[in-house]
Amino acid sequence: MTIDAHQHFWRFDPVRDAWITEEMNIIRRDFLPADLAPLLKAAGIDGCVAVQADQSEAETQFLLECAQGNDFVKAVVGWVDLRSPDVAERLAYWAEQPLVKGFRHIVQGEPDDKFLLREDFNNGIAALKKHGLTYDILVYPHQLPAVEQFVEKHPEQPLVIDHLAKPYIKKKEIGDWTKQIRRIARMPHVHCKLSGMVTEADLQNWKEADFRPYLDTVLEAFGPGRLMYGSDWPVCLLAADYTRQKAIVDNFIGSLSDTEKSRIMGGNAAAFYNIS
């Protein structure tokens, strides 16, 4: 099974979705399963993982509703307040929904660089394992020192870094990011998504060669057994259509074995998110 391990749906709301600025006009509209289905079919992708873009439990419910009648939506990564004293109760509720496979918090937007080390947040993370739920780590490179400490606290919790931790590709900054990624990747329970790269590059003038040093780094650090392809659609449309962004990964993994390619393009995501 081939899987796009990272995409979003939304009904655009200019207030709730204030992060989608006027400069992002191409994505200031609704994006729903009917929009994605033909793109997946054309790309030879069997299914996808729908990831939260809004921090509310209503978002988790919305993604489940998107999955109804759309069998290609194989998993939902929702949102729940992991800092809440009621987190155990809320996780028990969502764990009853078979498609809810994990959760994500938009840590990249937190002003505290050490947000991931908060005691209340870590209590919530510790409660995920009971229900077999995963956690997606969304951060910027300057937050990676906290990520290293965070992943060490939860050695049995399945964790995945979204978008290679958003390296500053446009600026060609790689040194500090590389050191941190290598340190974090030493921990076998941490995975990484090959996603979200085009929007960290020069949106209008990127070249595939721009991504190679970063892709080489994560392949060496995580190996083909802990990487998973994700489109970050529709956010990717700011810099590339579905076909162009997928081609970056396809071309990069072209020299790998068929087994390794199969794992990156779906097998790893299926195992991580418990997709059957």
What do the predicted segments below correspond to?
Residues 32-36, 58-59, 86-89, 144-145, ...:
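Alpha-helical scaffolding within the catalytic cores
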Residues 58-73, 155, 160-161, 212-220, ...:
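Short, electropositive alpha-helical surface patch
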Residues 1-3, 14, 21, 25-47, ...:
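Mid-to-C-terminal alpha-helical segments outside catalytic/metal-binding sites
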Residues 21-29, 34-55, 73-81, 101-105, ...:
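Divalent metal-dependent hydrolysis catalytic cores, especially in the metallo-beta-lactamase
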Residues 2-12, 161-164:
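Histidine-centered catalytic micro-motifs
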Residues 6, 48, 63, 76, ...:
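Conserved, mostly hydrophobic/aromatic
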